[in-house]
Amino acid sequence: MVKIRPDEISNIIRQQIEQYSQEVKVVSVGTVLQVGDGIARIYGLEKVMAGELLEFEDGTVGIALNLEADNVGAVLMGSGLSIQEGSAVKATGKIAQVPVGEAFLGRVVNALARPIDGKGDIASKESRLLEGPAPGIIERRSVYEPMQTGLIAIDAMIPIGRGQRELIIGDRQTGKTAIATDAIVNQKGSGVICVYVAIGQKASSVAQIVTTLQEKDAMRYTIIVSETADSPATLQYLAPYTGAALAEYFMYSGRHTLVIYDDLSKQAQAYREMSLLLRRPPGREAYPGDVFYLHSRLLERAAKLSDALGEGSMTALPVIETQGGDVSAYIPTNVISITDGQIFLSADIFNAGIRPAINVGISVSRVGSAAQVKAMKQVASKLKLELAQFSELEAFAQFSSDLDAATQAQLARGVRLRELLKQAQSEPLSVADQVATIYTGTNGYLDDLAPTQVRAFLSALRSYLATSKPKYAQIMAANVFTPEAESLVKEAIAETKASFK
């Protein structure tokens, strides 16, 4: 028979009493009234906050968006197929956060910053709010450093600065994504971290972008956030904020970042779908009344930070798709008013074989020459003027056959300058090469060549400068087009013409 030892029992009881905690954990629990189409209506979560994360019985996470008198409308971050009427829902007391850090570079993640590239988990110690506050007025400084894209048409005439928001707008299949990926490829060696956010795109398109960036060795400094067309509307709506949070980590550590949102039209459509299912009153084009705030709070997070905060920057290139070139539709006009300029791509120019298909006439950068290096300023102003005059003359020349010699010469120059702006995809040019190219065109050195020979000649000239005039690149490292650099370019033009067939 087992002998009972009172002292041992009293010790155990004493230990249990010492370990007892009076802390009471209060959990707010509700019940699902209705679920479907990625929306759940919940009864009982009386103290839930707007935007608070909710946890369902099956592990699905939702966000409380509609706080009504007798129920809460939540959007689901998943299919929610195993959620039933009467299921319990728990309020977490947390606002949506995503992990951030250096480990994300070179990876493809979803809107919850979880890897989807099959390369294993991402180790991260830090996290940031999905919808963090934008920097205030005192925390910013004016944009003054250039963000080179490697495209002559943009860097010369629509310059983008670090910390700017420049909209890329145009119809489908006009080369919007190509400009964005070229900008990423051109950041190689500049220390700029790139974040590409794919919203509602085909999985094959995203795979193609990943392949292009890998071939160009650009994935080392790039993070891709992807929510494809088959993703729930909630995740498509959240993806841009995830991209901004990942970029903010680097911006606040004094680094420069470039974020591409491709495209915000799809995000607006996902938000419209959620809002209509939540029975929010529709406005123009059935979008909810706060669709402007949807984009403004995202794009205001792009900034050039002050000296006190480390002078980091986040440059945003949002993409908007238009229908039939209509830039006066609701979402395009909203985003045009939020951004610091727009690059307008035209289907007519694209179909005419001019790539990139930028309509220079209505494209603008509101930062302007403040974001250009001195060498580019020296040669670009003449290019802008000559192309503007050419556009006017070209329209006039269609109605008149007998033109004087000066007008004919100006038209011939304009045709060659237009050829000069053409560039193949994923072949960005350095500032030195761009300056030499523009100088050659604006000073009449292409006038005696046939328009079909222009691109081949310029390519030969750039190769000749690199191999036979290495001093030119050394001088241009200071980003100033000196008389010595000019004479080297003149020599190279003459020598290339002598051997050019």
UniProtKB/Swiss-Prot annotation:
Subcellular location: Plastid, Chloroplast thylakoid membrane
Alphabetical list of HAMAP family matching this protein: ATP_synth_alpha_bact
Record's bilayer topology term: Peripheral membrane protein
Residues annotated to bind ATP: G170, D171, R172, Q173, T174, G175, K176, T177
Name of the featured protein: ATP synthase subunit alpha, chloroplastic
Gene3D superfamilies recorded: 2.40.30.20, ATP synthase alpha/beta chain, C-terminal domain, P-loop containing nucleotide triphosphate hydrolases
This enzyme's EC code(s): 7.1.2.2
A GO term from the CC aspect: chloroplast thylakoid membrane
CDD domains according to UniProt: ATP-synt_F1_alpha_C, ATP-synt_F1_alpha_N, F1-ATPase_alpha_CD
Top enzyme category: translocase
Keyword field: ATP synthesis, ATP-binding, CF(1), Chloroplast, Hydrogen ion transport, Ion transport, Membrane, Nucleotide-binding, Plastid, Thylakoid, Translocase, Transport
Subunit structure: F-type ATPases have 2 components, CF(1) - the catalytic core - and CF(0) - the membrane proton channel. CF(1) has five subunits: alpha(3), beta(3), gamma(1), delta(1), epsilon(1). CF(0) has four main subunits: a, b, b' and c.
Keyword hit for Lipoprotein: no
Similarity comment: Belongs to the ATPase alpha/beta chains family.
Site entry: Required for activity: S363
Catalyzed reaction equations: ATP + H2O + 4 H(+)(in) = ADP + phosphate + 5 H(+)(out)
GO molecular function, one term: ADP binding
NCBIfam families xrefs: atpA, PRK13343.1
Pfam (any one): ATP-synt_ab
Function comment: Produces ATP from ADP in the presence of a proton gradient across the membrane. The alpha chain is a regulatory subunit.
